[in-house]
């Protein structure tokens, strides 16, 4: 654990921002980045980190004392970080969170998960939302999903996009040998798990080669730029076999260190983000931040993001055949690679500081700070 504060010095208006989990986890990274952005906009913030649930339990007395002195206690929560099941995660948090805590809830349950999983996770998230004084989600889409579970008000603070286009333009995109050839590939960024879009990308490439013929020069490899989610190692073998049966290739790079992430995103031939059940996406934000315009499946969340940041996505409406529609979008990118880059006038706001101000306004209202 790091960042333990002297709670005797906690003034009203101070924020204890808590992250739980491995530093490379997307929700944990988001929490750390949000805490830093809150500081940059002038908030008094102390970041408390715990790499597992046991360490988090050790923070509980600190959180209780801080709340007693008027400080805000805010956590980023996805159920998988707090227990082996959603029910266990909710049991823990409902039991130990101090009165007046607030949460940003991630990975809101949705029906496409399947009846049993949706019911279990939905009940857990409903309990969490009812147990705290303020709930934040990352999109209007997520707020609607939460409203289907529980009658609790939730504020929307979008995932920020850091505009790194200028720095990216100056940098030479050098990637490790294990990522060589990205410029020839269709590339998905982030964790590998079912429904992320890898299978659809292979179907789309198959359709494109069917239309264009075997020697067309269209991409023949799909690269998953990121690690495999826990429990889904079998998916890699399944996708590899599927690709080979189609005359294509599939590879997984594994975890991408921060020092290579931007270079890898810049090097990618065709950015692809066809999440089946996406409700908030750090991988979409990553593509956008370096100036890439990803091909994305149209849906309530991606359409919301396209309205929030016009010009940042190439939305694909299936119109009967998702693979055929995606093949058309990939064909456009092959014929005109400039389509995979953002136009010079595209605005990427809200950024990290904008979103930090939104969150602080929520905390100010919840805690009635003057």
Regions found by a protein language model. Name each.
Residues 29-33, 193-210, 285:
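A conserved mid-protein helix/loop that constitutes part of the nucleotide-sugar donor-binding site
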Residues 175-196, 202-205, 222-223:
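Conserved donor-binding/catalytic core segment of Leloir-type glycosyltransferases
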Residues 92-96, 117-134:
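Membrane-proximal helix-turn-helix segments that form the acceptor-binding/catalytic region
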Residues 130-172:
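Donor nucleotide-sugar binding/catalytic pocket of nucleotide-sugar-dependent glycosyltransferases
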Residues 321-325, 334-370:
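A charged, aromatic-enriched C-terminal amphipathic alpha-helix characteristic of glycosyltransferases
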Residues 236-256:
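Nucleotide-activated donor-binding/catalytic signature segment of Leloir-type glycosyltransferases, i.e.
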Residues 263-279:
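Acidic donor-binding loop of glycosyltransferase active sites
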Residues 219-237, 254:
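Glycosyltransferase donor-sugar binding loop
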């Amino acid at each position: 654990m790091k960042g333990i504060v002297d709670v005797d010095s906690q003034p009203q208006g101070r924020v204890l921002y808590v992250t739980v989990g491995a530093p490379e986890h997307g929700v944990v990274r988001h929490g750390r980045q949000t805490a830093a952005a809150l500081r940059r906009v002038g908030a008094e913030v102390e970041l408390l980190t715990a790499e597992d649930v046991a360490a988090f339990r050790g923070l509980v007395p600190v959180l209780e004392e801080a709340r007693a002195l008027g400080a805000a206690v805010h956590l980023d929560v996805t159920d998988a970080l707090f227990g082996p099941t959603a029910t266990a995660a909710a049991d823990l948090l409902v039991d130990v969170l101090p009165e007046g805590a607030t949460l940003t809830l991630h990975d809101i349950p949705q029906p496409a998960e399947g009846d049993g999983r949706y019911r279990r996770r939905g009940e857990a998230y409903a309990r969490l939302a009812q147990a705290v004084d303020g709930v934040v989600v990352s999109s209007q889409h997520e707020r609607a999903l939460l409203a289907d579970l529980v009658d609790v008000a939730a504020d929307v603070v979008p995932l920020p996009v850091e505009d790194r286009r200028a720095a990216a333009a100056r940098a030479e995109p050098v990637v490790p040998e294990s990522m060589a050839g990205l410029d020839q590939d269709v590339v998905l960024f982030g964790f590998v798990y079912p429904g992320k879009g890898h299978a659809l990308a292979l179907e789309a490439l198959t359709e494109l080669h069917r239309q264009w013929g075997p020697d067309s020069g269209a991409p023949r490899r799909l690269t998953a730029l990121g690690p495999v989610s826990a429990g889904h190692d079998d998916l890699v073998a399944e996708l590899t076999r599927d690709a080979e049966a189609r005359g294509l290739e599939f590879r997984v790079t594994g975890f991408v260190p921060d020092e290579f992430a931007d270079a890898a995103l810049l090097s990618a031939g065709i950015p692809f983000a066809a999440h089946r059940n996406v409700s908030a996406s750090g991988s979409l934000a990553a593509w956008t931040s370096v100036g890439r315009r990803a091909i994305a499946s149209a849906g309530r969340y991606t359409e919301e993001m396209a309205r929030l940041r016009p010009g940042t996505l190439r939305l694909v409406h299936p119109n009967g055949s998702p693979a055929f529609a995606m093949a058309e979008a990939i064909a456009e990118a092959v014929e005109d690679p400039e389509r995979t880059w953002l136009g010079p006038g595209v605005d990427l706001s809200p950024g990290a500081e904008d979103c930090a101000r939104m969150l602080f306004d929520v905390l100010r209202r919840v805690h009635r700070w003057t």
